[in-house]
A protein has these predicted regions:
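Cofactor-binding loop segments of dinucleotide-utilizing enzymes, especially the Rossmann-like FAD-
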Residues: 41, 70, 216
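Glycine- and acidic-rich phosphate- and metal-coordinating loops
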Residues: 35-38, 68
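ATP-binding/phosphotransfer module of carbohydrate and carboxylate kinases, centering on a glycine-rich
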Residues: 1-35, 56-58, 78-85, 126-252
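Phosphate-binding/catalytic loop of phosphoryl-transfer enzymes
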Residues: 44-139
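Alpha-helical substrate-recognition element adjacent to the catalytic core
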Residues: 10, 39-45
Length: 252
């Protein structure tokens, strides 16, 4: 069962409670959970009490309720109860040092304008830049523009004037993945991942630990991620598109 996304940073308590009441509870029928473990983007420390309160009202018979951020979800999914380094690589990117129970260190990702190395948004930014500055074959540029119906003016407008520019840039990933046989394009993907290791993972000073990753970019570009990890002196651990299966194992 699933609902629309819940982000306690962007949504207020009333909105979240409505989502749970209208989208989750009807699907659960007579199921009475013994424990609820909520993990979500935007679930910072100052939002934990709010989320636990909302869930407590929705499930008054539940004995155990926890709310945590998506970074801990990724760490528990790929590392389980072992010490390790965990990364999120989707539209955005993040990473942490994990001690087998909690996040003990986190290099701030800074978003796709200032950081987010290894993310789909940054990959898209590199791709568009390389296309229009002659760093990739001209036929690749022509094919992409024809396939998407975009032009330079439209792209500039989407990036600088429309909302969710990060998602637009990340949407180039599908085309990039289909053309990895173009050598400079694959090298761009590998270099984007290498920058993630250099700028973020290296800060933990733990090349002895395996690096696991969650997210669509990590999952679909696993081969390139493995090349980048090896080039930077790391060993790649588990890679998952979604943390759900790993979290089920962790809490079982």
């Amino acid at each position: 069962m699933s609902t629309q996304g819940i982000n306690p940073f962007h949504q207020d308590a009333e909105n979240i409670a409505t989502v749970i009441e209208e989208e989750l509870l009807p699907k659960m029928g007579n199921i009475e959970p013994e424990g609820i473990f909520f993990y979500g983007s935007g679930c910072r420390e100052d939002k934990v009490e709010m989320m636990c309160g909302i869930l407590g009202k929705a499930f008054p018979q539940c004995a155990r309720i926890e709310a945590q951020g998506d970074l801990l979800a990724a760490a528990r999914a790929v590392c389980g109860e072992r010490e390790g380094i965990a990364c999120i690589m989707g539209t955005g990117a993040n990473s942490c040092l994990y001690d087998g129970n909690r996040v003990v260190e986190n290099t701030p990702p800074l978003g796709y304008i200032l950081g987010d190395e290894g993310s789909g948004a940054v990959l898209g930014k590199l791709f568009v830049n390389a296309l229009f500055k002659g760093q990739l074959p001209s036929e690749l540029k022509d094919e992409w523009l024809e396939e998407t119906g975009l032009s330079l003016n439209i792209i500039i407008n989407k990036v600088y004037r429309e909302p969710l520019a990060n998602r637009f840039l990340a949407s180039t990933s599908r085309f990039i993945h289909q053309h990895l046989s173009v050598e400079p394009l694959e090298l761009m993907v590998v270099d984007n991942f290498r920058e993630h290791f250099r700028c973020n993972v290296n800060q933990y000073g733990r090349k002895d630990l395996k690096v696991g990753a969650v997210g669509s970019v990590a999952y679909y570009y696993r081969e390139q991620l493995e090349k980048a990890a090896a080039a930077e002196g790391y060993s790649l651990g588990k890679v998952m598109r979604s943390p759900m299966d790993g979290l089920v194992r962790y809490h079982s």
